[in-house]
Amino acid sequence: MSKREEVKISEEDLNKQREIINKLREINDAEYERTGKRKKHLTVTYGCQMNEHDSEKLAGILQNIGYIETNDKNEANLIIYNTCCVRENAELKVYGNIGSLKNLKKEKHDLTIAVCGCMMQQPHVVKEIKSKYRHVDLVFGTHNLHKFPELLSTSMESDNMIIDVWDKEGDIVEGLPVTRKYGLKAFINIMFGCNNFCTYCIVPHTRGRERSREVQEIIDEVEELAKNGTKEITLLGQNVNSYGKTLEEETDFGNLLKVLNKIEGIERIRFMTSHPKDLSDSLISAMTVCTKVCAHLHLPFQAGSNDILKAMNRKYTKEAYLELVEKVRSKVPNVALTTDIIVGFPGETEDDFKETLNVVEKARFNSAYTYLYSLRQETPAAKMENHVPDDVKHERFNRLIEAVNRISGEINKAYLNKVVEVLVEGTSKTDDAKLMGRTPQSKLVNFAGNKEDIGQIVRVKITEPKTFSLNGELLK
């Protein structure tokens, strides 16, 4: 565990939560016997895959309590907003959606409204909700998700808003029930928190310091998933390259990949996110020797200017990043690189931005998550001078998007007439008559096929490359 002071979570605490789950289940079962109706919950998730997986845990707890899911807020007895605070836009959406529930709350006296996640770790947000959104029933954060049964029970018995936000991370809690959003694919937390303190980022304040799960706990979870038909796992961490540093047993992320690669039933292993300063030879080696580890590396570079990188506290240079790209490509020739890029960080000049474009041209990413810099309270960047005007940020952003999309389209054109292996995930979102799946490089492929192929790895010949996806024909 981290040397930082933490909240200890005892087995007694966890047993208490299990008892409350059983008690609530009995109450809900009795109500179902009386009315023939199950209570329903709607969970809306904002942000990253870590938040998505947290919502899967909340859904697992609620399923054990006797709730079923709904997508209709008018049907729901419980509405949860699992929030993100990485960018202001996500926060504004949350406030808007919470506000829109005020009239529904007046109409449905049995409706419970809960907000949780990263936004709630910020004191000014909790203060805002207390003063302006008094129809909210329950507020909790990222560190005490295991207490959700108790908090829900207390909230349902109280006329007051229940607020329980821990300002320190606790022990990692294993064994929480999970209702997976996807059958074939599964998210798996291998660690929590971040120690990097990039000057623009709020995550270390909302997710706490780095803590790694024990290797055996991860193995047990993956083996159980494999038994239940999961074919692809995605290992999650704010910085997976730091995995193992807080464990007593000496290990690292590369070794973990090699262990998981041996588990029967799992066909593909993905992971995110990797910090460039911590990308090790051990990880690169694992990508070359582990047959199940996908040839896809998400490696955020954020900015191309060394001055901006220093101001961001990224702890690498443009030159070092490009050398790393070449190193990875030399060892894993078919690797697909994706990245994150921020436009308009405080002090960014036109020359700085051109350095970012230069990295995009040299690294030739398969795709990129591109963002306008968003000021976050409690971060050093918020106090910096020379904030870039919005019109300049948007103009640069559009130029960046053009470059990223052009290169992505060029890379995809090279797939014409190639045969690729696709894990079939389901029907296409754009055409119900077609199937869709992904290559090891995470390329989205649409093709005609039989639904019996869902869950299988099939060979597809690419007949029509597009900028963001590939069309093909199934080979028998």
Swiss-Prot record:
Belongs to the methylthiotransferase family. MiaB subfamily. It is found in: Cytoplasm. Catalyzes the methylthiolation of N6-(dimethylallyl)adenosine (i(6)A), leading to the formation of 2-methylthio-N6-(dimethylallyl)adenosine (ms(2)i(6)A) at position 37 in tRNAs that read codons beginning with uridine. Binds 2 [4Fe-4S] clusters. One cluster is coordinated with 3 cysteines and an exchangeable S-adenosyl-L-methionine. One of its GO terms (molecular function) is metal ion binding. PANTHER family: CDK5 REGULATORY SUBUNIT-ASSOCIATED PROTEIN 1, MITOCHONDRIAL TRNA METHYLTHIOTRANSFERASE CDK5RAP1. Residues 413-476 form the TRAM domain. Disulfide bonds: none annotated. It comes from Alkaliphilus metalliredigens (strain QYMF). [4Fe-4S] cluster 1 binds at C48, C84, C118. Residues 180-410 form the Radical SAM core domain. It comes from the Bacteria. GO terms for cellular component: cytosol. Residues 39-157 form the MTTase N-terminal domain. Its cofactor is [4Fe-4S] cluster. This is tRNA-2-methylthio-N(6)-dimethylallyladenosine synthase. Its EC number is 2.8.4.3. PROSITE patterns: MTTASE_N, MTTASE_RADICAL, RADICAL_SAM, TRAM. The keyword Ubl conjugation does not apply. Monomer. The keyword Iron applies. It catalyses: N(6)-dimethylallyladenosine(37) in tRNA + (sulfur carrier)-SH + AH2 + 2 S-adenosyl-L-methionine = 2-methylsulfanyl-N(6)-dimethylallyladenosine(37) in tRNA + (sulfur carrier)-H + 5'-deoxyadenosine + L-methionine + A + S-adenosyl-L-homocysteine + 2 H(+). [4Fe-4S] cluster 2 binds at C194, C198, C201. InterPro entries: Elp3/MiaA/NifB-like_rSAM, Methylthiotransferase, Methylthiotransferase_CS, Methylthiotransferase_N, Methylthiotransferase_N_sf, MiaB_methiolase, rSAM, rSAM_horseshoe. Pfam families: Radical_SAM, TRAM, UPF0004.
